[in-house]
Design a protein with these regions (language model features):
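Extracellular adhesion/carbohydrate-binding repeat motifs centered on closely spaced tryptophans
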Residues: 1-443
Length: 443
């Protein structure tokens, strides 16, 4: 190329028939090569990277593949970095997110593929100190992942419809205006969101560990408390299946669920416990996890300690009665003999049914005679103040028990030292029931 002065142009831009070229120090146009230089019409501007194709023309408004990597150039030929919007007609720095058309190029200009980026949203300046940053994942096609990414380095991640990775409690939501489905974080400060409001719920940890948890128990805060810095808020156990879905009883099931109350062992007796500040009953669903039975409320929170079922659900195999699910970090239905400490640290014996039969139900605390011991809602009744005492069951059945809880059924004087505590010597032998069952030896 020869300039207007008739001299050979060297190491400079050349414009010819509306196309732009660059010549090297020998005056030959460069092809299939890069140049870091100032723009064609502004020598005072910052240098940018440009690519010149096999015909020498500057790459403009297009994607170029160079050494198996993709690069994007705007209408002025400038190589773009960061978020880029591209379709077959135009290339530009991204001002917002466009599904299937938003890509990310690193500082070398190469499009990221099968890789993560922690960045501000498209259209936001990188140096904006007030701007939030998010994790984005770009697939092998270079397109940003939205929705559920099921095999990202062996893990599942959830993204909203603008490609932002979601953390904490995440639910599949439906827009009221467009009916579009989208994975969004739920809960947080001032939130009234409850897990029972949603069908598909996942738990994805924090932004440093954002994959959906799977096939495990996970203990964490409710959605409304998850982002709260108050560590005094209660945490609950949730079951997450192999697909990452948090177990939440379905709306259809909850309409026929059993109902019950929480209890605690307090001062040697079972006392009703408040739930969410009240003594109102709540719905209960039984679910088997890893061959063990658990109770859940409608928000998928595993229940523990003592639960009395007052409205049964035969479909779940739940009958009325007192059940025990161990401590706060256990939760599996207990059967057989159990030792439980009360709030004072004293230990008491319980017995819960081991099978369903005419005399007991699996998991239900025995009320009455079991192996010649007297129980009430599973709690072994014993003589406390004296060697023998009369214990009443359901205000109808009366038993004589000793300090071990053994039922006495002889027509004798029951003494402690020389004092007669209970005089049954005048009773007929038939006064003690001999009918086999829970009330055998009752008076």
């Amino acid at each position: 190329y020869v300039g207007e002065d008739g001299q050979l142009v060297r190491s400079a831009w050349v414009e010819y028939d509306g196309n732009y070229y660059f010549v090297n120090s020998s005056g030959a146009k460069i092809t299939n090569d890069w140049r870091l230089t100032t723009p064609y019409d502004d020598d005072s501007a910052d240098e940018e990277w440009y690519y010149f194709k096999s015909n020498g023309k500057r790459a403009e408004n297009e994607k170029i593949t160079y050494k198996s990597k993709s690069y994007y150039f705007d209408s002025d030929g400038k190589m773009l970095t960061g978020c880029v919007t591209y379709d077959s007609n135009a290339v530009d720095e991204a001002n917002d997110f466009v599904d299937g058309k938003t890509f990310y190029c690193d500082e070398t200009g190469a499009r990221l593929e099968k890789n993560w980026v922690y960045s501000v949203e498209p259209g936001v300046e990188d140096d904006d100190a007030d701007a939030d940053e998010y994790w984005y994942y770009f697939k092998s096609s270079g397109k940003a992942q939205i929705g559920k990414g099921t095999n990202i380095k062996g893990q599942t991640y959830l993204f909203d419809n603008e490609g932002r990775m979601q953390t904490g409690w995440v639910a599949l939501t439906t827009s009221t205006s467009s009916n579009a489905k989208e994975y969004l974080e739920i809960g947080g400060e001032d939130s009234t969101a409850k897990l029972s409001d949603y069908t598909d719920v996942y738990f994805c940890g924090d932004e440093d560990d954002g994959h959906a948890k799977k096939n495990k128990w996970y203990k964490t805060w409710r959605p409304e408390d998850f982002d709260d810095e108050d560590e005094d808020n209660d945490e609950f156990w949730y079951w997450i299946d192999k697909n990452g879905k948090v177990y939440i009883p379905t709306e259809a099931a909850s309409g026929s669920n059993a109902t019950g109350y929480k209890y605690k062992l307090e001062d040697a007796a079972l006392a009703q416990k408040k739930v969410s500040g009240s003594y109102e009953s709540f719905e209960i669903t039984k679910k088997k996890v890893n061959s063990k039975d658990y109770f859940f409320n409608n928000d998928g929170e595993m229940l523990s300690q003592f639960i009395e079922v007052v409205t049964p659900n035969t479909a779940d195999g739940l009958v009325t009665g007192m059940y025990y699910f161990g401590g706060d970090d256990d939760g599996s239905m207990m059967t057989g003999s159990q030792s439980v400490r009360d709030d004072n640290g004293d230990t008491y014996k319980f017995y819960f049914g081991t099978k369903n039969s005419t005399s007991e139900n699996k998991g239900v605390g025995i009320t009455g005679n079991k192996s010649n011991k007297l129980y009430y809602k599973g709690l072994l009744l014993t003589a406390d103040d004296y060697k023998y005492q009369i214990a009443t069951v359901d205000d109808v059945h009366f038993f004589i028990v000793n300090k071990n809880g053994s039922i006495q059924h002889s027509c004798v004087e029951y003494k402690e030292d020389s004092d007669v505590l209970i005089d049954a010597s005048d009773l007929a032998k038939t006064a003690f029931s001999t009918t086999e069952g829970l009330y055998k030896y009752s008076i």
